[in-house]
Design a protein with these regions (language model features):
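Structural/interface elements that position substrates and couple domains in central-metabolism enzymes
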Residues: 1-99
Length: 99
């Protein structure tokens, strides 16, 4: 399974949905893991950390192309078009989106 991690786009969100350690375990279990370049920067996790874990560093389009997409925050309206037939694992925070 290809598991992908796009960078978070919500203002002031510095977390990333998957650490290099977690990615390493998924890779060891036979999964392909792709992380958007710079996605871990706000959490002091470098692209080199992910590369050492066996992750492929990709652009935003590829980061949304996985069989399973991991995010911390709910998708923003700008990200809605990227929600096609993929599985998304995230917190939805539905009440936070109320007008």
């Amino acid at each position: 399974m290809r598991i992908t991690v796009p960078a978070e786009t919500k203002v002031a969100e510095t977390r990333v949905a998957l650490t290099p350690e977690g990615a390493s375990e998924l890779v060891a279990d036979g999964h392909e893991v792709w992380v958007q370049r710079g996605a871990g920067a706000g959490s002091a996790l470098s692209d080199d950390d992910y590369a050492r874990a066996g992750v492929s560093l990709v652009d935003v389009d590829d980061a949304w192309s996985g069989d399973l997409v991991l995010k911390v925050k709910e998708p923003t309206p700008e990200e809605y078009p990227r929600l096609t037939s993929r599985a998304l694992f995230t917190y939805l925070h539905l009440a936070a989106n109320e007008p």
